[in-house]
Amino acid sequence: MDRRTLTAIVLSFVLLTAFQFYMAWKYPPAELTGEQVQSGESSAPAPLASTAPVADALPPPVEGMAGSAPQQAMSQPLINTDAKSLLHFKNDLVEGSLSLQGGRLVGMDFLQHTDVLGGKPISFMGISQVESFYQESGFLPVAGSAIKAPDANTQWQLIGKESLQGAGEFKLVWDNGEGIVFEKLFSFAQGSYLFKVEDRLINNSAAALGVYHYSQFKRIPVINSQSMLAMSDFQGPMAYLNGERYQHSYEDLTAQDLREKGHGGWTGFSDKYFLAAMVAKPLPPEAQPRRYYFDYDRPNYRVGMVENSVIIPAGQSLAVDYDLFIGPKEISTLERSNLSLERSIDYGWFHFLAEPLVKVLNFFNSVVHNYGVAIILLTLAIKLLFFPLANKSYRSMNAMKKLQPKIEELKKLHGSDRNKMNEAMMKLYQTHKVNPLGGCLPILVQIPVFFALYKVLFLSVEMRHAPFMLWIPDLSAMDPFYVLPLLMGGSMFLQSKLNPTPSDPMQAKIMMFLPVIFTVMFLSFPSGLVLYWLVNNVLSISQQYYIMKKMEHEPS
């Protein structure tokens, strides 16, 4: 990487980082543009097209802990996790559990992803003394109705087996004793992170019922402060509605509740590598939109959706089904769902470049079966793609270098008159057909590609625990022996020797210390990123040497 490229990237990195800090301080990191409401308030929904209007509210807190401090609430499990109350299911990708108490999904382990390298399967959802993460859904009566509905303590009855493998369906039933039967079906398939949930209400009573359906995630997360490297890594409540992504931090939801409306999309919790999302069936454009909510129901953060209220006549029934995706944010897996789940990966401003880059990276890995080698091949492909631009840049730099003696003469002749000096230099450039910006513009074009690739390597779950070779067991972790950062620093030092020494003494000192600064900074970077930078430097050195040698034999 030549001096101009390095300077441009460093300046761009500093400016982008400073801008992100400013925007995070000045404005929320991302907006939920819906109406802000106070806790406990809700607006009356419009009915489905085929029903009469009835008023309702958002699902109330069901643990009865709304007034408790978070520390008190977390000191004991929120849900009965007794083995007798749990139903277990397993396919080739996940192992999970449902609780008969409350009819909730209370556990989800990813069998192909471990908590640490060589460790046990990562537990993404579950109940513990420190954190909890579960999903629930069902029907609730509209305001003013006295229907006895299932709650957090309801013990559902299982129809069928208590444990399923490969593929299957659990059926839970609860009769309220007043002629109303509630049913819940949870189904899963082999080789999939998608689950289907169907809630049914059978009205065998003598009166019509006014109800609404809700589904929600509740989570008590362990919130860690983010490092500088993870400034752009969003983790928290997220939704994709009406063709737009909405996201908000946990801290923001402690101050205010947020609401949105939409005819289709998904909502849930997004982590760096994993996603839990509820996907409702799309509504027709003429229908009233469903409502989505994001709030802090102490000690839980809640993300959910509420269907429009509906009246069920006596002797009739109602069924509402939706999909759950709970799995890793692998771009190929998300796109196969055809549910726009890939929008949960935020590549930032340069997403239009990052998305094809991650696909090319995955293609190379499918061929060589090693993401480290895939990074090398991708870096080589990018270098080949930009070779014409680099060639133009080096040629422009060489032409400017040849004009340097004449420029010095002009400085001596017109040094005290800036206007005449500029006019003389422009004539000189025109005479020799040299563009003074010719060496910079090709480099500026490459900077977005660099940042896009940075995001790809930093956010891709495919990099998590992916080995390279020898001493690199995990491309998403730092080099345990600092070999790659030291090699990278050495390559930068070699580059500085290939480039001419800057005439400005201060700039010369900065360029001399840059390899040391970057080496120290890269010590804690994921080894996959350091590998990219090292390979890029080696290829740049080779490229620069080749072009300069070729130009030495060309006539001036």
Curated annotation (Swiss-Prot):
Record flagged with keyword Protein transport: yes
Keywords: Cell inner membrane, Cell membrane, Chaperone, Membrane, Protein transport, Transmembrane, Transmembrane helix, Transport
Transmembrane portions of the chain: 5-25, 370-390, 441-461, 468-488, 510-530
Localization of this protein: Cell inner membrane
Region (Disordered): 36-74
GO-annotated molecular function: membrane insertase activity
One GO cellular component term: plasma membrane
InterPro entries the record matches: Membr_insert_YidC, Membr_insert_YidC_N, YidC/ALB3/OXA1/COX18, YidC/Oxa/ALB_C, YidC_ALB_C, YidC_periplasmic_sf
GO biological process annotation, one example: protein transport
Protein topology in the membrane: Multi-pass membrane protein
Cited Gene3D superfamilies: 2.70.98.90
Keyword Transport: yes
Any one Pfam family match given in the protein's UniProt record, by short name: YidC_periplas
Bias type Low complexity, positions: 42-55
HAMAP family: YidC_type1
Oligomer status and interactors: Interacts with the Sec translocase complex via SecD. Specifically interacts with transmembrane segments of nascent integral membrane proteins during membrane integration.
Described function: Required for the insertion and/or proper folding and/or complex formation of integral membrane proteins into the membrane. Involved in integration of membrane proteins that insert both dependently and independently of the Sec translocase complex, as well as at least some lipoproteins. Aids folding of multispanning membrane proteins.
Protein family (similarity comment): Belongs to the OXA1/ALB3/YidC family. Type 1 subfamily.
Cross-referenced PANTHER family: CYTOCHROME C OXIDASE ASSEMBLY PROTEIN COX18, MITOCHONDRIAL, OXA1
Full protein name: Membrane protein insertase YidC
Taxonomic path: Bacteria, Pseudomonadati, Pseudomonadota, Alphaproteobacteria, Magnetococcales
